[in-house]
């Protein structure tokens, strides 16, 4: 049971590992569990606290492991259950916790439950999934769309019924209305906790409760009928009661298209649901008119507004944010909101500071601490991601020019973050002695962990310092948030307020100089200013600054005694 006043995960920093692309010890081109064990000391040097592993369960890998075939076994290319147990043990020896990624909105259609369900309309497993008859005119049951394109319904010709798949056709949605499904899920969670894990990251968990009327969407893709659905809070409270309450664990829910109000309900400890949530609104400010697969500069003022609304809203409601720029589904942030050319190192540090000095639990995605960039693939044969390949074919059918398709995929593909971690300057960045499952980014000779560890001014050591500041100053965890100069077109500045101190965080998001003046009322002259961290040369005074391109500074302001 959680008894301590400040739960451990509020001061923790999480490192996300995408095992397939992390470190390969067998030479088969695919990362593995032993590869993670081999790099635990590197992660300890970074000073992170928690490792989150994206799915390592047995899977046909149509969606890189988010299509689970067997919840109780390890995907053979990653290793064995013994390897996993050794990973947990070796991590714990280094005071590193291990969080598993769990997908319970859907399973692979190769899962034994689905194979049983589709075998007969009378199967006891039929009701583990969501089946509907066609409409009277013979069309699909509803006009809901899959998030990977096309209808969310797939016909089972043998029975004449359709099953629901909000994602790929090989990912059938589970029926959470069925108590047996929920019991099986909770039993499986206990199995992994008994293996010694420290928590779960729950994939698209706010989609598990569907509106049982299954109405047609008047506009859009139908998401309003299953996002933050009618019974989702009931189900998560039950999950907490049956499972999480028995362990000193950390739980984080991935929330698709959610709201601040729902995330307060998910994470306020009084509700006993989850510990924290991921939301993605700040990663849609470069979607023109909400369209992911179109190119546009990011809307900086909108970015500041969204991050600030989540900071103030979640704090006021007693919720807790997961803080992040990157994951396995997003492009590399230095290519997206920074400058991956001349200002790569400086903008990567600035972006790190901007997110890490907020309230919440920060997440670092593998390679982010090195300032890894989008790979800028020029050939469709380099891509592996099902969503990207679907979009490529859709664009080709529309007659879009190849160079335009290339530009969109280079900016938007999920494969941007899935290229192998660049460990050193040897072939394939030291990731594998074989042929990597996806090409390594071409800049691995310049951008790699070995070079970063040798250079005290590297992005790596900037992340390390941010982690140290979080551990040293409670204000980072507990202070309130106030945005400054919210309409400034270049600078993202905010204050964190404590009882006798403040943190002033100033970030220039662009490659040009920008003037900044701190209002006197926010930091009176008699307050003492100390620079905790900068990505540039130190400067004197707080007034009338001209920030250099991508400059970032953290001041600690203290009241005189």
Swiss-Prot record:
Optimum pH is 4.5. Activity is stimulated by high salt concentrations with different efficiencies depending on the kind of salt. In vitro, inhibited by glucose. It is found in: Cytoplasm. Optimum temperature is 37 degrees Celsius. Its EC number is 3.2.1.93. Its main location: cytoplasm. The record marks 329 as: Transition state stabilizer. The active site is at residues 203, 254. Induction: Induced by trehalose and repressed by glucose, fructose or mannitol. Belongs to the glycosyl hydrolase 13 family. PANTHER family: ALPHA-AMYLASE FAMILY MEMBER, TREHALOSE-6-PHOSPHATE HYDROLASE. This is Trehalose-6-phosphate hydrolase.
């Amino acid at each position: 049971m959680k008894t301590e006043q400040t739960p451990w995960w509020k001061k923790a920093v999480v490192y996300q590992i995408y095992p397939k692309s992390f470190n390969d010890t067998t030479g088969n081109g695919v990362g593995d569990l032993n590869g993670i064990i081999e790099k635990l000391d590197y992660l300890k040097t970074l000073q992170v606290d928690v490792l989150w592993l994206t799915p390592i369960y047995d899977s046909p890998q149509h969606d890189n492991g988010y299509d689970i075939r067997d919840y109780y076994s390890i995907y053979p290319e990653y290793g064995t259950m013994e390897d996993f147990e050794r990973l947990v043990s070796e991590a714990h020896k280094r005071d590193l916790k291990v969080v598993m990624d769990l997908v319970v909105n859907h399973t692979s259609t190769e899962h034994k439950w689905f194979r049983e369900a589709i075998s007969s309309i009378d199967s006891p497993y039929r009701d583990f999934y969501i089946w509907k008859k066609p409409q009277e005119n013979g069309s699909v049951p509803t006009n809901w769309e899959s998030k990977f394109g096309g209808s969310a319904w797939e016909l089972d010709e043998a029975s004449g019924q359709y099953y629901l798949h909000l994602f790929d056709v090989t990912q059938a949605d589970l029926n959470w209305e069925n108590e047996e499904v929920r019991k099986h899920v909770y039993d499986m969670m206990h199995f992994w906790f008994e293996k010694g894990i420290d928590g779960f990251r729950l994939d698209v968990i706010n989609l598990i409760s569907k509106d049982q009327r299954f109405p047609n969407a008047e506009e859009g893709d139908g998401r309003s009928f299953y996002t933050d659905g009618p019974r989702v809070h009931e189900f998560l409270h039950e999950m907490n009661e049956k499972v999480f309450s028995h362990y000193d664990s950390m739980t984080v829910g991935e929330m698709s298209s959610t709201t601040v109000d729902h995330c307060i309900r998910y994470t306020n400890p009084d509700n006993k649901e989850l510990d924290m949530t991921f939301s993605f609104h700040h990663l849609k400010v470069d979607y023109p008119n909400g369209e992911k697969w179109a190119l546009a500069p990011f809307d900086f003022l909108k970015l500041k507004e969204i991050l600030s609304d989540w900071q103030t809203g979640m704090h006021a409601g007693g919720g807790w944010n997961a803080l992040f720029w990157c994951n396995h589904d997003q492009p590399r942030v230095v290519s997206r909101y920074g400058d991956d050319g001349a200002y790569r190192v400086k903008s990567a540090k600035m972006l790190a500071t901007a997110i890490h000095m907020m309230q919440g639990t920060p997440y670092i995605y593998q390679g982010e601490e090195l300032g890894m960039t989008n790979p800028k693939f020029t050939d469709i044969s380099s891509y592996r991601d099902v969503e990207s390949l679907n979009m490529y074919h859709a664009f080709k059918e529309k007659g879009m020019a190849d160079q335009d398709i290339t530009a969109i995929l280079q900016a938007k593909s999920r494969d941007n973050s899935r290229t192998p971690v660049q460990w050193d300057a040897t072939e394939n960045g030291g990731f594998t002695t074989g042929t990597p499952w996806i090409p390594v980014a071409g800049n691995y000779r310049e951008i790699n962990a070995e070079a970063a560890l040798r250079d005290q001014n590297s992005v790596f050591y900037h992340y390390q310092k941010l982690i140290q500041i979080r551990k040293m100053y409670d204000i980072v965890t507990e202070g309130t948030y106030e945005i400054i100069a919210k309409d400034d077109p270049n600078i993202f500045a905010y204050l964190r307020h404590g009882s006798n101190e403040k943190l002033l965080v100033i970030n220039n998001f662009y490659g040009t100089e920008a003037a900044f003046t701190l209002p006197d009322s926010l930091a009176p002259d008699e307050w003492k200013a100390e620079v905790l961290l900068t990505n540039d040369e130190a400067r004197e005074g707080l007034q009338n600054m001209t920030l250099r391109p991508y400059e970032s500074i953290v001041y600690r302001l203290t009241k005189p005694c």
